[in-house]
Amino acid sequence: MKLHEHQAKTIFADAGIPVPDSRLATTVDEALDAVDEIGYPAAIKAQVHVGGRGKAGGIKIATDRDEAEQYAEEILGMDLKGYTVDQILVEQGVDFVDELYVGVTMDRGEGQPVLMVSTEGGVNIEEVAEENPDAIAREHVDPAFGLHPYQARKVVYEAGVDADVALDVASILTTLYDLYEENDASEIEVNPVMITSDRDVIAADAVMNIDEDALFRHPDLAEMAEESYEDDLERKAGEYGFDYVRLSGNVGIIGNGAGLVMTTLDLVDYYGGKPANFLDIGGGAKAERVTKALDMVFSDENVDAVVFNIFGGITRGDEVAKGINEALEQFDEIPKKVVVRLAGTNAEEGMEILNTDLVEVEETLEDAVQRAVKNAEEVTQ
């Protein structure tokens, strides 16, 4: 579960991490009331779960009331990488002289949490990791012993952080690790940490992702879950128990098993398409769940074509086929072309059940993906 920036900053502030004064607004009038209280300059920030908000026009700095009104009007309701902005954070501007990145995530290769610090703050850290990996200092933490204070100081100094603010940055990093551990987070970061001319250290942004399977241990975070969903599709996925991630492409993808869905995503990209989503219906999916999955994908206006990839183990091909037929029979006109590939348990029975007037059937995954990509291209031409 991804927390919004304002939610994560509330948690950070409660833990003692310095954050700018801010107010949440859902209307232009609320935004103007907020800047009247906070003063100028003020950052007007879209609250959506996407990276690169600034480059996409989702963050603006207002220096007076007219600009604040203009930017609030522009950002509220805008489409930001497929998400509609319905709330903004109005935040006190920070006069900074330097920017850093600090974060904690799980290194799955090592099976341990890893602290990360870089003086390349304020930019996409994934790009830094790819283009200049040495610019990120790392320190693994043995979960059996926890974080030792010297480890935070060590990784901060190794990153080349100025000595006069290094201890303050190490303190923020230590607190982030504590929050990471206490809240069953999968990722927590600040990008950027801003250093002011007075050498104050301020968390100007906040990212905090929580393991949804651990929410039963955190009722306070569970209460944030409803607000953290960006749209009805994510909300539906949570209700249905699907693993769902919305992407920016136009080829809808449904499968059973995370690995199978990821393989399908890779093939869509390989054959020149753009995946619109990751949707795993899980093992043993009955017709009802398949119907719900198709309904979800059809509801995404960005989807132009759908590929359904099922390998039967626990999931029976005949049940999946029934679900596909039931879902498609609900429509007077099929809204998107659907390509189906079935293999494994009861796959032959499933292929016979499928109504080929409603779907296109392919025997191999490669053929199914190529047809779906072609179908999507035909819609956009």
Swiss-Prot record:
ATP binds at residues 45, 52-54, 91, 94, 99. It holds the Pfam family ATP-grasp_2. Mg(2+) binds at residues 191, 205. GO terms for biological process: succinyl-CoA metabolic process; tricarboxylic acid cycle. Substrate binds at residues 256, 313-315. Its cofactor is Mg(2+). It comes from the Archaea. Keywords: ATP-binding, Ligase, Magnesium, Metal-binding, Nucleotide-binding, Tricarboxylic acid cycle. It catalyses: succinate + ATP + CoA = succinyl-CoA + ADP + phosphate; GTP + succinate + CoA = succinyl-CoA + GDP + phosphate. InterPro entries: ATP-grasp, ATP-grasp_succ-CoA_synth-type, ATP_grasp_subdomain_1, Succ-CoA_synthase_bsu_CS, SUCC_ACL_C, Succ_CoA_ligase-like_bsu, Succinyl-CoA_synth-like. Its EC number is 6.2.1.5. PROSITE patterns: ATP_GRASP, SUCCINYL_COA_LIG_3. The keyword Flavoprotein does not apply. Pathway: Carbohydrate metabolism; tricarboxylic acid cycle; succinate from succinyl-CoA (ligase route): step 1/1. Binds 1 Mg(2+) ion per subunit. GO terms for molecular function: ATP binding; magnesium ion binding; succinate-CoA ligase (ADP-forming) activity; succinate-CoA ligase (GDP-forming) activity. GO terms for cellular component: succinate-CoA ligase complex. Residues 9-236 form the ATP-grasp domain. Belongs to the succinate/malate CoA ligase beta subunit family. NCBIfam families: PRK00696.1 (NF001913), sucCoAbeta (TIGR01016). PANTHER family: SUCCINATE--COA LIGASE [GDP-FORMING] SUBUNIT BETA, MITOCHONDRIAL (PTHR11815:SF10), SUCCINYL-COA SYNTHETASE BETA CHAIN (PTHR11815). Heterotetramer of two alpha and two beta subunits. Succinyl-CoA synthetase functions in the citric acid cycle (TCA), coupling the hydrolysis of succinyl-CoA to the synthesis of either ATP or GTP and thus represents the only step of substrate-level phosphorylation in the TCA. The beta subunit provides nucleotide specificity of the enzyme and binds the substrate succinate, while the binding sites for coenzyme A and phosphate are found in the alpha subunit. This is Succinate--CoA ligase [ADP-forming] subunit beta. It comes from Halorubrum lacusprofundi (strain ATCC 49239 / DSM 5036 / JCM 8891 / ACAM 34). The lineage of its organism: Archaea, Methanobacteriati, Methanobacteriota, Stenosarchaea group, Halobacteria. The gene is sucC.
